[in-house]
Amino acid sequence: GIYCIFEGGTPDDR
């Protein structure tokens, strides 16, 4: 997974 730190700072697998 990738940490979407630019979308809130939560780990989001995309």
UniProtKB/Swiss-Prot annotation:
Cofactor: Ca(2+)
Keyword annotations: Calcium, Carbohydrate metabolism, Glycosidase, Hydrolase, Metal-binding
UniProt EC number: 3.2.1.1
GO molecular function, one term: metal ion binding
Chemical reaction(s) catalysed: Endohydrolysis of (1->4)-alpha-D-glucosidic linkages in polysaccharides containing three or more (1->4)-alpha-linked D-glucose units
Source species, domain of life: Eukaryota
Binding site for Ca(2+): 7, 10, 12
Cofactor note: Binds 3 Ca(2+) ions per subunit.
Family label: Belongs to the glycosyl hydrolase 13 family.
Quaternary assembly: Monomer.
Protein name (Swiss-Prot/TrEMBL): Alpha-amylase 1
